Amino acid sequence: AQALVDPGTVQVTSHSYFEKEADASRDLARPDGALLEDALLPWARGMVRPRPAAGETIEARILSSLELARLRHEPEAWLLGTLHRSGGTETLEVPAGSFVVDVLTAEVAGGSGSRTWTFWVEHDAPHRIIRWTRSDGVDARLLGTAREAYWNENAERYRQAVEALGLSPRPPRTP
């Protein structure tokens, strides 16, 4: 599925092999100040509006996640959301090190269940997401970082660069 965002509408297109779903395309009127649940990661980094000030809570309409709509076989819908930024910073330890972070939460209510996203975002630029969780059990932590010309490092000899990030190289593809 994909969502194309315009100032007043969001066009959602999906393709499915499930019975009674097939291919679908629909336009949803976009309320002022609304955002997509799928855009919460860039929202937490300050790249998507609205941007709550420190200690502020904002109510917003949030378009349900394309991922969750797909997995639950239900149409996307505008849900009620509460966006909050913590009033101060805290220090967070993850495998990649220790970071001073801001904590942001997004509560999404409605559909087939409410969920809460929590983001620990590096306080200083570039405002990397250091950790994020979702109330359904998703928990992601920054394992490592490297500022590299990665587009040049795609051969077998760069295998150790992958391992240095705490990741395992993918197995070779089979024919």
Predicted regions and their residues:
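N-terminal trafficking/processing presequences and adjacent post-cleavage segments
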Residues: 31-65
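Acidic, serine/threonine-rich low-complexity disordered tracts
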Residues: 1-28, 57-175
